[in-house]
Amino acid sequence: MDITPFLNRTLDIPLYQQLYRYFKENMHRGRIQKGMKLPSKRLLANQLSISQTTVERAYEQLAAEGYIVSKPRSGWFADYHDSDFAYDRMPSTTPIQQEAEENKQWIDFHYGNVDSSYFPFSAWRKSMVNSLDQYGHELYRPGHVLGEFELRTLIAEYLYQSRGVHCGPEQVIIGAGNPILLQILCQVFEPNISIGYEDPGYPRARKIFEANRMNIVPIPVDDEGICIQKIKEQQPNLVYVTPSHQFTLGTIMTINRRIQLLKWAAENQSFIIEDDYDGEFRYTGQPVPSLQGLDQHNRVIYMGTFSKSLLPSLRISYMILPSPLLKKGHEITSLYKQTVSCHSQLTLAEFIKNGEWQKHINRMRKLYRKKRAIVLEAVQRELGEHVRIRGENSGLRILLDVYLPFGEKELIEKAKKHGVKIYPVSLSYQHHPPTKTVSLGFAGVSESDIREGIKKLKAAWKI
């Protein structure tokens, strides 16, 4: 394979990040196909006149996010295909079509987008300057492998107040996105153990578990959350759940189901990975405590991120380890360099400490509550009895079950012809996927575009 990235040494972006982005972009564009072998670290380092460490860090990040896998005595192979990730951008068949698609003005209901127009850039800039003034040359030192102590302390305090999470700063590990933290977590456990995984569930997490030789045990999800009886029948060593806003269906795990899951984990000395996906955004009913906050036996690993509530590009996530896993977790983490810069961490710490974070999250909750109301009203008005809405009580997207004579793929293609991007749901399933359900993320779409986009769906589907 010919690798010809242009690595710009004059940029502030590290070379390994530039190399990582090159591979990621070319996989998304289809230029690097699933199964293709990547150059060895030594060969690529020599070819690009960079260190093997630079190549290794780029490959590690790609592997952590599920883009490549290492095969013993064979090397690194591309493991990415758009269909592997349920809501990734759908590829064009040619570079010309790809370029035309990128230049087109879409109404894009991607679930991962946020409304950046409300980001408090002036307050963030002030926090950046304050952190520079306060820490100065300390910012040039290598970051603590667990993350900066001040930020870890503030995260522990915030999680206790907002989600009832009980932890100290020594239990907090910071990383550049949940995939990297999951990669670290997988190495805390022995290979070939079994992990109960929500079906449907988060595809990227599944790929990371598989890449780390874990045995995936699909567990169905109903209106109350993951099915405990199926867990008891399968007896996995671990269970991965998204209880605040089930990744695909959008359901909120009931308090009764949470207690049952915790009881099972305690009785079987098993661990639960609680991915608090979209936990900040709930629109109806009383907030349900986190599993970690309810846990009395140290069986829950808690994961969260600032990506949805701040900006995805900031890439700051965190993982809370229970005390039985601390020693091994710290040992594994020490093998990696910290993936979030000191400056970014200390800027966020200033942002939280000065009260800007709480003001911002309150503002975004109000904004997204309004957008949710707009999308629900527009769907009911324009699409009416031809659809059923699901997952609307929390999070930043909804599902539509469509009662029309079109399958999922055709529904998406018809929408694209009218300038609207909606996304499939079926690829999140391992068994019995729905054939006529699509996902609409509303956070990153303007209020006027939400209304216009739903009107265009009505026209596209000839309702």
UniProtKB/Swiss-Prot annotation:
Residues 41-60 bind DNA. CDD domains: AAT_like (cd00609), WHTH_GntR (cd07377). GO terms for molecular function: DNA binding; DNA-binding transcription factor activity; pyridoxal phosphate binding; transaminase activity. In the C-terminal section; belongs to the class-I pyridoxal-phosphate-dependent aminotransferase family. The modification N6-(pyridoxal phosphate)lysine is found at residue 308. Keywords: Aminotransferase, DNA-binding, Pyridoxal phosphate, Transcription, Transcription regulation, Transferase. GO terms for biological process: biosynthetic process. PANTHER family: HTH-TYPE TRANSCRIPTIONAL REGULATORY PROTEIN GABR (PTHR46577:SF1). It comes from Bacillus subtilis (strain 168). Residues 13-81 form the HTH gntR-type domain. Its cofactor is pyridoxal 5'-phosphate. It comes from the Bacteria. The lineage of its organism: Bacteria, Bacillati, Bacillota, Bacilli, Bacillales. The gene is ydeL. This is Uncharacterized HTH-type transcriptional regulator YdeL.
